[in-house]
Amino acid sequence: MKNFSMLVSHVLVPPAIEAIMRSPGNRVQAFLAAGHVCSVMGTWQYPPVAARFRVPIVVTGFEPLDLLEGIRRAVVQLETGRHEVENAYPRVVSELGNEAAQGVIAEVFEPVDRAWRGIGVIPARGWRLAAA
């Protein structure tokens, strides 16, 4: 095939949240987890992160009402001293995610060190195309 290339820049989000929370001068008080990522990967990886760093994580979609609901839920958690994972996007996201898609990801990609702009390199937390 001529004149064909692919830019693969897939990453795992929970390790990035951990890196942000460990960074000096961090002032992040809550996270909105991207619904499109969680629709594939699920929410099951987030509770240990929320507990370890005592930070609310709310899964949300990208529609204005979805975002506002995610922000509202994060604020309620902050006001009540909670630090849990909430799924504000249940019409798309489940705890386990899309297991068929996860199987394809495991088949097609392999873990790689990935640089995140503003964070640095996170070891073995990105994906690249696996050798054929």
Where are these regions (language model features)?
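Exposed alpha-helical structural elements
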Residues: 16, 27, 45-48, 100, ...
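Active-site loop-to-helix "anion-binding N-cap" substructures in soluble metabolic enzymes
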Residues: 7, 11-14, 18-22
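Internal helical hairpin/lid segments
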Residues: 69-132
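A conserved active-site cap/scaffold subdomain adjacent to cofactor or substrate pockets
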Residues: 7-9, 26-95
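A short alpha->loop->secondary-structure connector
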Residues: 1-5
